[in-house]
Amino acid sequence: MAPSQHPKSAAAPATTSDQMSTASSRPTNGTAHTSAETAYPSSMTDSKPTQSGPGSRASDEQDADEAYSNHSEQHMDHSNPDGHPSKPSGRKKKKKAKKGRAGSQTLGDESSTPLSTPSVSMSHPLPPPLPPHLGTRTILKSAKDRSIWNTSTQEERENIKTFWLELGEEERRQLVKVEKDAVLKKMKEQQKHSCSCTVCGRKRTAIEEELEVLYDAYYEELEQYANNNQGSFEKGSPIVPPPRLYQPPLRSPGQHTRTQGQFHPSRGRIHEITEDEEDLEEDYDDEEEDDDEPYSDDEFEDEETRAARADFFAFGNSLTVKDGILTVADDLLKNDGKHFIDMMEQLAERRMQREEDTQYNIAAAHQSLHSGHNHPPYDEEDYDDEEDEEYDSQEEDDYDEDEMDTMTEEQRMEEGRRMFQIFAARMFEQRVLTAYREKVAEQRQQKLIEELMEEQTRTEQKNAKKAREAEKRKEKKRLQKQAKEEEKARREAEKAAEEAAAKAEQEKKLEEQRRKREEQRKKREAERKAQEEERARKEAEKQRRLREERERQAEAERKHREQKEQEKKKREEARRKEREERELREKKAKEERERKAQEDQKKANQETPETKRTSHLGPVPIPANLQPQGSSSHLQSPHLQSASPAVPKAPTPAKARQPSQQGSHGSSPRSQQASTEPFHTSISPRSMAPSQSSGASSVASKQGYGQQPMLHHPQPSTPLSPLGSVNRSLPPGFASAGLPSNPPGLPGMVPRPPIGHELPTYPPHSGPLMNQLRGFPAPNGIPIPPGINGTRPLAPGRGFPLEAAPGLPFHTQQPIAGAFASHQGGMSHGHSRQPSGSFERSPLEPHAQPFPISRPSPIKRPPSTQQEQSDANRATQRDVDNLSAQLGSSALLDDTDIPFTSNLSQSLPGATAPGSLPGPTRASFGAPSLFPDPLASKPGGFPMGPGVGANTWGTQIPFVSSAFPGAPAWGTAHGSGWSNNAFGSGGHHRAHTSRPVAIRLLVIQACKQLDTMSSSKAGSGYHDVKIVLQQVEQLRPSNEPSIPLKEMLDICDTEGNTQNGGGSFSIKKDETGEFVKFEPDNNSAASGHRGSIVPGEIGSPVPSSSMPAFGGIGNTPSVLRQFSSPTGF
């Protein structure tokens, strides 16, 4: 019997170690052993060993304790203090290791003895004392438990027992029913995923029936226990302790180095319980409280300690029932229940097998436990490690098949039922304990609420008492304060009465003082008013005198101005008459000269028909009706054709006029024009050097047909005679050789004189070979635009103009005599000394070209005499002297006539010289020059001839270096077809102005016209704005948009200056309407008579050459001319 006592003797330490496995205390050496009485009641430790047998109550409770320990262990393992499930593997293994360590210390030398199957008459020895490392922790833990639920005392256990007995039958049945329903629900949920065959369906039905039977029997036992007040759960046959079928020998400590994954904690805690159900509930509660701590310090123990305690697991494995009955609580608490379902399936299979075949042997029954209907194996996580280890250890340790066959089928079934009853009892205990705790918690909560209410009531009473005392103190203070305030009010009333009396006396004194000051103030005010009236009267008198003085001065100035204007009108009328007479004389003289020239030309053409072949002289101009018609599409050779239809007469040189008579008129702006009278020029071939002629002839012989000879050969150094040539030209308005003198679409333009009419003092850049003279087309007949080919450079400092090339037609038409007459332009005379007697030809003189040596033509009689020319020059000179006396520097001395801010174009309008076109002013759009100068005149003595050739671009005139003495700077000669200016040649036209300026000028002009036409507002100068707008609309060009009244009034508010007409507008409104008046000043057009120039006056353009531009507001040359933008000097 000695060996059989080892398991029983080790049961108590195992139970104790499982209860305290979660205590977080490290092992301490030297701690005295503490008796079990400190942790357990005397009823558990002092009981004597009892007989354990089939009918023993102690053996039944040992088995029940085993099931309960498994249940509580798994419950605490998978439920953290916060209520969340923990990981199922790690925590369980740690608890197993700790339990193994706790139990291994109590085995000692007995661990080497193999365990045997316990006998029926097994006895229980007293449990050994607690291990030294658990004593202190157990005491502290018990104190903690008592402080929370106080379930370790006998009184508390009695309370639990009383609570159970006080429950009614319906409440007890309800607890059992809840337990049964939970298990059935779990079973059904687990069976959902199994197969739906007939066998499995029968198995499920058997499981449910088995559960019904088990729970019904369990409830009957509970009723008997409650009615009989017994200490056990059953009254019938006692629960037989589980047979120890498979008991492997204990292993040495060296074989358990990996205890955490190889072994499992004990699934049964076998200790002696002499008390009733409340003792078991106490054990369960202690373990549950101990297990709240998530970690334990025992986990940090070294491997040697773990290995030394690992052999305790062998004993724990030996207590595990084969069919896994003790793991049902673990499965249910893990919400898994697979092992419990497996057990129930086995029970159902056993039941079915008994019904079907009672002849099966034990081996077949054992195999049916593991191979029921080929279900898939459970998940590795769902399998408890203790099953794996116990089955492995059972297989490794050579199970005794003979012992396994000794148990009958009925014993196994009975064993299963008893294990289920133990499990159900433990689960039911938990529910009873939970119900009890809920009741206690509710009672304590109610008690706490009552205490809180009492506390609150006491606090309220205390606060009310304090409030009453404070109210009393406040009332007392209020009464004291009220008495003080009444006393203070009485004193203040007395003081106020005294102050009121004093204040009344003071007010009386102040009122007397104010009355005296008011009287003094009124007196001073009267004196100051009288002084101001006297001062205002004096100021008004002074202003009246000043106004009268200004009026007298203005009247005197007006009279003076009117007198000057009358004198000016008289002078201008005299000038106009003189000019008309002069023009008439010039016209007659011009007609006489033209008639003589035509007669001389006819005579020359009749007398020398054969001279043209050898003379190589240029043709003289002949009338268009005498010009032979012919056409040529190419340039002719310098060698003249033998079959020329017309041979011009070579002009005869006349005696040069002395320039001394020019000196007296040097200050006149028209002196250059008047002093430069044209004369005939006779250039004989004998004047050319033989070397030049011979050298040029060889060069000319090499030129291709239609090419122009080079013009850059050295020229003779003889000076050019200042004699001018006789004007030989067609009358104005006739075309040369039947070609139009104006471009198509531009009628009315007067052609300019031929080439050489106005050449500058300084030459332009030299051009290429072709088109040396502007106006001559290229050999292919296409005219070259201006600026491509230029003339050959003149000698620096010379102002000599070009002459037409006699006899060399540079155009595609037949040579025209009238278009190539030799003309000598007027020179710019800077001094009056006698020029050199040498003859120096111009560098661009066409006669300087090489010609072949031939017989000279006979000298003929000159067409006019020196006496006739002198008479004509004297008549012209008198006219220029007259003009110089009135339009010279003396015209600039009158400040009233010409304002200081006016342009030069206002004071000195250009006068037209006899026989030439008037020069355009600065404001002219149609000016052919780039920088025209109204002070300069055109070289005189040239007739109004037609254009030269058929060049549509016009004859290009070289650039001039000065703005005053010369002619236009970069213009074209009139009559050449197209002008360089895109707007054509014309009269006085304004420069580009903005619309507000143009509208203001139109309003000024409209007001002036209305001043002369009507006497509205009694001659005050105010005109209705609508009438003014109508007048402006009449003056507005048709191509400009209409002018609204608001825009005109807005522009009238602008200040006047030299650009927009000057002056100012006065606008006034009354009941009849709105009126406007223009008040001129020094910058306005009304300040002098020169602002408006009408045709026929001195400086006015010839009406035939005054052509308006194509666009722009206002075709009013008289107004816009004097406000043109100034040109550069």
UniProtKB/Swiss-Prot annotation:
Cysteine disulfide links: none
Compositional bias (Pro residues) spans?
A: 741-754
The segment annotated Disordered runs over: 1-136, 229-307, 361-413, 453-879, 903-937
Location relative to the cell = Cytoplasm
- The molecule here is called Stress response protein nst1
* Coiled coil location: 441-608
Which PANTHER family does this chain map to?
LD36051P, STRESS RESPONSE PROTEIN NST1-RELATED
Comp. bias intervals (Basic residues): 89-101
UniProt main location, coarse? cytoplasm
Q: Where is the composition biased (Basic and acidic residues)?
A: 72-85, 453-473, 482-613
Q: Which keywords does this chain's UniProt record carry? A: Coiled coil, Cytoplasm, Stress response
Primary gene name: nst1
Pfam families from the xrefs?
NST1
